[in-house]
Amino acid sequence: MNEMLTLVGQLRSDFGTSSARALRRQGKVPGVIYKKGITPIHVCTLEKEVAKLYRKPFFSSTVIQLQVDDQRFKVLPKAVQLHPVTEFINHIDFILVEQNGGIQKVKVPISFEGKDKSLGIKRGGYLNIVKRYVDLLCPVDKIPQCIKCDIANVPVGASIKVSRLELPEGCNLVKRTTDYVIASVIGKSSKQDKEEEGTAEDGADSK
């Protein structure tokens, strides 16, 4: 499991656009904690503190201990809204994580590795990333920071499907029945391959 991050917040009782704007003028971010079966918990936190966490690697898959007044919540980031110009964090939603070893749905980043060794990229292709995250069901104490995907042996024109990912023990895809594409190596079709095949054939004919 990732190292747990910490954040301090306050409960808020005023809602709506004007209230949210007032909080932002004070350097605070309105937020909501969600969990199926409970009433949403409205909170606010300091924008500068949220921004520090937001810039950390693997933010979306890291459990945060959120201290709200005299209560503590273990949460995962669900959605972050940024100002379109200033990139100030305007709003943040959290998911209250399952307790006592429960199974948690979480959005985990995909880390594409082996680009420097990729045969397809060396031959003029480039990596077209379709999905940067994968939705998993994980034990709360085994949420991975990221899921690695080795593309070293992926040729030009090949697609990489979600079934290629090696998931940690106990973690499963939310959509098990759909083997969707997460990336592909695209570029000029293998002119170089044809030239190499021609060279090989010439060599064979000369023997």
Swiss-Prot record:
| CDD domains reported in the protein's UniProt record | Ribosomal_L25_TL5_CTC
What keywords are annotated for this sequence in UniProt? Ribonucleoprotein, Ribosomal protein, RNA-binding, rRNA-binding
| Listed GO CC annotations | cytosolic large ribosomal subunit
What Pfam families does the record point to? Ribosomal_L25p, Ribosomal_TL5_C
Q: Name one GO biological process term.
A: translation
The entry's family comment says: Belongs to the bacterial ribosomal protein bL25 family. CTC subfamily.
Q: How does it assemble?
A: Part of the 50S ribosomal subunit; part of the 5S rRNA/L5/L18/L25 subcomplex. Contacts the 5S rRNA. Binds to the 5S rRNA independently of L5 and L18.
Q: What HAMAP family would the database entry show?
A: Ribosomal_bL25_CTC
| Biological function | This is one of the proteins that binds to the 5S RNA in the ribosome where it forms part of the central protuberance.
What's this protein's name? Large ribosomal subunit protein bL25
